[in-house]
Amino acid sequence: MLRSLAENFCTPAEVLTKLNHLLVEDFPSGRFVTMVYAVLDPGKGTLTYASAGHLPPLLVDSSGARFLETEMGLPLGIRHGSFSEATVELPERFRIALYSDGITEATNPEDEEYGTARLATHVQRPDACPDTLLGDVRSFANGTGLRDDATVIMLCRK
């Protein structure tokens, strides 16, 4: 479904709006999904993205780490609506992390969350990749297990 929409609609906001329309019609009451939809344009050096109730992308460059601003929007499948998008110009070297709340909300035995600060610190490491981040989250959880899905995608240009 997403692939078909991506081929027929131009922007992340349009794709999320159409996908949401389809899911509102099909999802049982109380069901929803969050996501960030992003389009990387290497030729222009930009990332255009829209959020449906999902956490913001994390951009790391030579100046450090920052969470990309955008309207979060409602999760998909709740009610009809539209989404906004933002475009960021990417530096020559960067790393972008897209991640689920299972990463930031993972807890240790003291019930402390992994959080966004630890996420940003880890993603700034030169060796950071999805495997090292997931390993760090599991190590932080110290045997308590993960209560939610822990998903991460990283895009890099070095």
Q: Model-predicted segments: where are they?
A:
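Conserved subregion of the PPM/PP2C metallophosphatase catalytic domain
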Residues: 3-158
